[in-house]
Each structure stands twice: as structure tokens, then as C-alpha cells.
Amino acid sequence: MNRDTSPDLHYLSGFGNEFASEALPGALPVGQNSPQKAPYGLYAELLSGTAFTMARSELRRTWLYRIRPSALHPRFERLARQPLGGPLGGINPNRLRWSPQPIPAEPTDFIEGWLPMAANAGAEKPAGVSIYIYRANRSMERVFFNADGELLLVPEQGRLRIATELGVMEVEPLEIAVIPRGMKFRVELLDGQARGYIAENHGAPLRLPDLGPIGSNGLANPRDFLTPVAHYEEAEGPVQLVQKFLGEHWACELQHSPLDVVAWHGSNVPYKYDLRRFNTIGTVSFDHPDPSIFTVLTSPTSVHGMANMDFVIFPPRWMVAENTFRPPWFHRNLMNEFMGLINGAYDAKAEGFLPGGASLHGVMSAHGPDAETCEKAIAADLAPHKIDNTMAFMFETSQVLRPSLQALECPQLQADYDSCWATLPSTFNPNRR
């Protein structure tokens, strides 16, 4: 199938907006959504990301004006190769850490290279999250959509060109991309190979966190989120359309590109965000604030203040707290923490936590800075200090994350992770305060 040449990429700015875009002038109907005859002979189609009757502030839906309706497809057949078919592992309360996963030697496109790491709900549930590491060394020729949830992509190696139904966006390490549930897309590799992390959100769509006493500005600012403008492919010829449904890959063959949306308007859109634009908040007096101040996006639950999933980053920042143990404190958490590292080093781990690696601390798993970090922090001169050239992140969820069997059996699982705390000394002296 012949594709259009790469367009000059343009974006719409904002988060949660009611956007509108057209690749041909006048392709958007005026004053209504579904006219008897749409402009240019297009078909009108609605893509719903939430229930019809959600509050307007939470509603996600987009009207698409396309060359052929999505209903024009044959029967889906289950693919023989099921890369995500492995079960969750047995109950395991231990702290876990993985070295970086290698890029496969055999040709592997974006959807073939997902390694399941952990999950806390089946895809049929209206809540929860599944976490993967993706690895790829060839661009996709087929098109994919995920019926199981919204996808948050966190590249660690390699730039991605993501062609979606609504337009094209390019994402590099230190940027993220979010693709709504059910939206068709294709991932092309701009650097030959790629690796990164995926959070598959089965719950409420991601949104910006409330700022509370921080005020009307700070953290991730809405204007820095970018949604691609309309771009369509008018191509004849066979293309495989793959869907992920309840964790399995099913496919059919089309005789046209399904990325044929000429115009669209709505709020259920793909977007990208540059993590370097995050307005980091921290103390200017004493103590280390809770890591919730680093939240970029959140998927809420019905319990106010408890997240189905938070996406949290630990970016470059100044440390100026006086009379304070500056690394993240020792902690036992109600929430479950899956961490990854995009570049640099994480300030709570001197060794062993590498870019492309991961860690999992389940509910009430005791964790904190390793022995080397702790020793240095207690003895440090508390002059202002900048943590630079780093970007760690966390997928945090209120439901227990169970590691996959593949993650527990892979050679990258570090058997000696607990040893990073083993040399923490007892410095208690009841005779000296």
C-alpha cells in the first residue's frame, strides 16, 4: 500500500479542549454533526470515549468525517501469535527490580514487542491498569487499535512517528503520547529501533490533576499539550487491521487505509506532551513534600483523592531544603508504585536502576533510598544543589499490581535487589541526641 509522504507536522494546543480540524477546506459540517450529505461525500462517525451521559466536564467524544466508515471491514480472526497471552505470576509481595530489556534480534514491530510487566485488573473491568515495556526494530505496516484501554506511551529510546486517525505526531524520549481507547494508529520508527514503557489505562480517561492551594498555574500546564491536526491517507490496497480485545490480538484485512479521516471535531483526541515543560514544585524551607506534587496526569476513581492511576515524574530540580534529609524518604505506601527511568539516574538509587529498567513496590512494601544514597545524604553539605540530567517516572495505582509470569521469569529480574538496603547501619545511641 502506498502512503502519502510525511506531512509538515502541526498541532493544536490545549488539554481537554473541544478541538476542530480539517485537512480540506469546508470538510467540517457547519452547525450540525451528521448532515444528510456530508461535505466531499464523507461519512460521519462518532467515536465515544465516555458514556453519553457523563458530566460535560468529563465527556470525551469526537466526530470523524472519513472516506469510508469503520464499519466497512470483514470478520476479525484471532491471530496465531499472541504476544500478550501469558498469565499473571503467583502472589509475590517482594520488592522487584529489572535491568533494561534488550531489543529483540528478530524483526519486531511496535505491537509485537510488548512485554507484559504487571497488571491489577482484567481488560474487561472498567478500572485498573496494565503495564508493558515495548521494544521494536521495524516500523509497522499494519494499523492497530486497542479496545481494552487508553494508552500512555513513554519513550526511552528512539523517536516514534505515530499516524493516528486524527493526524500525525512525532514523539521522542522525554516526551509522552496518549492515544484514546479504540483510536486506530500506526507506529513508525525514526531511529531504527525503539524502547519504552506503556501504561494501559482501563479506567477513567487521564486528566490534569487538581492544583488545590498551588493555585491556577503549575505542574503540567494545559497549553503545552499538543494534538495533531487532521491528515488523511487515501490509499487502495491490502492493509491488516489489528485490534487488542480482552488481551488478545485479532485481525482482518482491509482494502484501504483506515487512517482516512479528512476532518474531525471533539475532545476524544490523541496528544503529546514534553516532560521538560513540567513546572516543578518543591519546598523552599524544609522537609521533602509528598511526591503527588510531581503528578502530570491522573485517572480518578469514585473515591475522591484516590487515583486509579497517576503518572508522576521526577524531573531536574533544585534541592534547597534546610536541615532536611533531601532524598525521597523511607516509605510504606497504600498505593502501588511501578517506576521507570528515561535518562540519567534516580536520586534515591545510587546504582542498579538504569534507563530502560523498572521497579515494582507493592502495597505496604518498605522502600526508600539505598544505603549509599542514605549515607551521603546524612553527611551532605546542605548548600543549594540541582539534580540535573535525569527523568524518572512512576505509574502509581490504588489497586495491587501483580507482576506477569514473563516479568518474574525473565533474566533481567534482579535477584539481589534487596541487598541495596542490606548495609544500612543502626546509628541509634540512647546517650546522644
Swiss-Prot record:
Q: In which pathway does it act?
A: Amino-acid degradation; L-phenylalanine degradation; acetoacetate and fumarate from L-phenylalanine: step 4/6
Q: Known SUPFAM superfamilies for this protein?
A: RmlC-like cupins
What keywords were assigned to this record? Dioxygenase, Iron, Metal-binding, Oxidoreductase, Phenylalanine catabolism, Tyrosine catabolism
Give the result of residue 346 to F, as annotated: Decreases the affinity for homogentisate more than 60-fold and reduces the catalytic efficiency 20-fold
InterPro entries reported in the protein's UniProt record: HgmA_C, HgmA_N, Homogentis_dOase, Homogentis_dOase_bac, RmlC-like_jellyroll, RmlC_Cupin_sf
Which Gene Ontology MF annotations are present?
DNA-binding transcription repressor activity; homogentisate 1,2-dioxygenase activity; iron ion binding; transcription cis-regulatory region binding
Give the induction note: Induced by homogentisate and repressed by HmgR.
Entry's family note: Belongs to the homogentisate dioxygenase family.
Any idea what this protein is called? Homogentisate 1,2-dioxygenase
Record lineage: Bacteria, Pseudomonadati, Pseudomonadota, Gammaproteobacteria, Pseudomonadales
Gene that encodes it: hmgA
